[in-house]
Amino acid sequence: MAKQTTLDEFNAVFPKLEEVLLDHARSYKLPQEQLDWYKKSLEANPLGGKCNRGMSVPDSVSLLLEKPLTEEQYFQAATLGWMTELLQAFFLVSDDIMDSSITRRGQPCWYRQEGVGMIAINDAFMLEMAIYTLLKKYFRTHPAYVDLIELFHETTFQTELGQLCDLLTAPEDNVNLDNFSLEKYSFIVIYKTAYYSFYLPVALALHQLNLATPSNLKQAEDILIPLGEYFQIQDDYLDNFGKPEHIGKIGTDIKDNKCSWLVNQALAVATPEQRKILEENYGRKDDAKELVVKKLYDDLKLEQLYLDYEEKVVGQIRERIANIDESGGLKKTVFEAFLAKIYKRSK
């Protein structure tokens, strides 16, 4: 029987990895003040999140093996998981600067913390490099070492392409709904979110077990990318229709001029008059204008449109899962676990 990891088990691996990273920096005779800074960044940025991406690696390895992991297997899987969390930290530190964000996980964003400022850009680079330090330390002799390096490079670049498309499509200070389209939306969510959040953890698990055949990777990608797209569309839906007490935050997509699924669906069906309402009210930091857009979303019955979309896409994903070829070591349960976590979630 496979066994799910807990956040406590997963977090317990980090101090050992942190020590490896600090030792690596020490090997260059980095002065103590700068070493302390690196330690502070390593503790402020990768830690404190839900670790869904990172924990998906040991969970997937256990499902692939259909049994609980040995101590060594767990350590390897959790180390790969922490690399996804370091990748996420690198993206978030950078993203918060680009978006001029204020808070992250209930704290001021790293670049807004005392004395940090634009040093955060270099800290982000160092978080990215930590991935490759850990890969070399623990996977140098693994048959998939080069594949793992290439997977992280490829996933990083894919995420950066998604981010570029997002930044150029929806600048916060320049509202132009002509920039938006469902094709662009789909590109942004697939590249900015789906690859690193959904495909990467399973690809890492397959590589750890030497099961990353072209067929297994392709089958995983064909399910996990649509799953990641569904997850982001659900996020956009919850931003407007979710209850703040459930999702833990107040939605800001309308005020932030986000290229969200809802605004794209609205643009696709709006009359010229309704489009004019959107153009005059979307992306404005104004409560009254936000309410006008919310009312338009209700008038256009976007909630029902989402619920219909959800049933359709989940049906397609379930069909793909049912048709998985398990002869090469892939397991349907890996994908069922992902779907179960997000289907009909309220936060």
From Swiss-Prot:
Stored Pfam families: polyprenyl_synt
Binding site for isopentenyl diphosphate: K50, R53, Q88, R105
Cofactor note: Binds 2 Mg(2+) ions per subunit.
Record: residues binding dimethylallyl diphosphate: R104, K192, T193, Q232, K249, K258
Annotated catalysed reactions: isopentenyl diphosphate + dimethylallyl diphosphate = (2E)-geranyl diphosphate + diphosphate; isopentenyl diphosphate + (2E)-geranyl diphosphate = (2E,6E)-farnesyl diphosphate + diphosphate
Enzyme class: transferase
Residues bound to Mg(2+) 1: D95, D99
Keywords tagged on the record: Lipid biosynthesis, Lipid metabolism, Magnesium, Metal-binding, Steroid biosynthesis, Steroid metabolism, Sterol biosynthesis, Sterol metabolism, Transferase
The protein's name: Farnesyl pyrophosphate synthase ERG20
GO MF annotation list: (2E,6E)-farnesyl diphosphate synthase activity; dimethylallyltranstransferase activity; metal ion binding
Record-annotated membrane-spanning stretches: none
Highest taxon of the lineage: Eukaryota
GO biological process, one term: geranyl diphosphate biosynthetic process
Keyword Metal-binding among record annotations: yes
UniProt pathway annotation: Isoprenoid biosynthesis; farnesyl diphosphate biosynthesis; farnesyl diphosphate from geranyl diphosphate and isopentenyl diphosphate: step 1/1; Isoprenoid biosynthesis; geranyl diphosphate biosynthesis; geranyl diphosphate from dimethylallyl diphosphate and isopentenyl diphosphate: step 1/1
Cofactor: Mg(2+)
Function: Farnesyl pyrophosphate synthase; part of the second module of ergosterol biosynthesis pathway that includes the middle steps of the pathway. ERG20 catalyzes the sequential condensation of isopentenyl pyrophosphate with dimethylallyl pyrophosphate, and then with the resultant geranylpyrophosphate to the ultimate product farnesyl pyrophosphate. The second module is carried out in the vacuole and involves the formation of farnesyl diphosphate, which is also an important intermediate in the biosynthesis of ubiquinone, dolichol, heme and prenylated proteins.
Binding sites annotated in the UniProt record for Mg(2+) 2: D95, D99
